[in-house]
């Protein structure tokens, strides 16, 4: 199974969330977009929490993802 590119190589801004925890990086499990770190280049890249298939778990999971806004995969 080929792992999906979740944008882990794209520079992002590490910020503390209102709950005191650090934002989650691409590939981390999430429940909402606000938990995910934003890309440094917010014009070129979009960040969010998206549903991905996990072959390991045999179910869908939500993971932080950063992708190019011009990509059809974003």
Curated annotation (Swiss-Prot):
One term under GO cellular component: extracellular region
InterPro entries found in the cross-reference section: Cys_Knot_tox
Transmembrane segments: none
Disulfide bonds: 23-37, 30-49, 36-64, 67-74
Entry keyword Secreted: yes
Superkingdom in the source lineage: Eukaryota
Pfam entry (one): Cys_Knot_tox
Keyword list, A-Z: Disulfide bond, Ion channel impairing toxin, Knottin, Neurotoxin, Secreted, Toxin
Disulfide bond found in the keyword field: yes
Localization of this protein: Secreted
An annotated Gene Ontology molecular function: ion channel regulator activity
Tissue specificity field: Expressed by the venom gland.
Protein family per UniProt: Belongs to the neurotoxin 21 family.
Role this protein plays: Neurotoxin with probable ion channel impairing activity. In vivo, is both paralytic and lethal, when injected into lepidopteran larvae.
Domain notes: The presence of a 'disulfide through disulfide knot' structurally defines this protein as a knottin.
Protein name, as recorded: U1-cyrtautoxin-As1a
